[in-house]
Amino acid sequence: MASSAVIKLALVVALCMAVSVAHAITCSQVSANLAPCINYVRSGGAVPPACCNGIKTINGLAKTTPDRQAACNCLKNLAGSVSGVNPGNAESLPGKCGVNVPYKISTSTNCATVK
């Protein structure tokens, strides 16, 4: 019984000493979360709730400057690769979902300046 407690204590100490590793946001995460937004950025109209949920998810994952820059680059690439995107619709999307994104969703955004 005592050895079980020692093992548990050792595991707790090891976990406390572990260095946390930052995981950058991936473009596949951004694409998957924003797939419900495609029709809106092409045609306008009502923003689907699933789209806003995706934007909120991505914004919530972007806690650090590198994460925000990675998300920005993914959004910039998506905006340029999806055919028929209306730039105004893409730019207005965060505001319509009540999300404060610290950069413009545009193919001209300089993501290196995002903090």
UniProtKB/Swiss-Prot annotation:
PROSITE patterns noted in UniProt: PLANT_LTP
GO MF assignments: lipid binding
Pfam family, one: Tryp_alpha_amyl
UniProt keyword annotations, A-Z: Allergen, Disulfide bond, Lipid-binding, Signal, Transport
Disulfide-linked positions: 27-74, 37-51, 52-97, 72-111
Signal peptide region: 1-24
Example GO biological process: lipid transport
Function noted in UniProt: Plant non-specific lipid-transfer proteins transfer phospholipids as well as galactolipids across membranes. May play a role in wax or cutin deposition in the cell walls of expanding epidermal cells and certain secretory tissues.
Family: Belongs to the plant LTP family.
Protein name stated in the entry: Non-specific lipid-transfer protein
Organism field: Pyrus communis
Species classification: Eukaryota, Viridiplantae, Streptophyta, Embryophyta, Tracheophyta
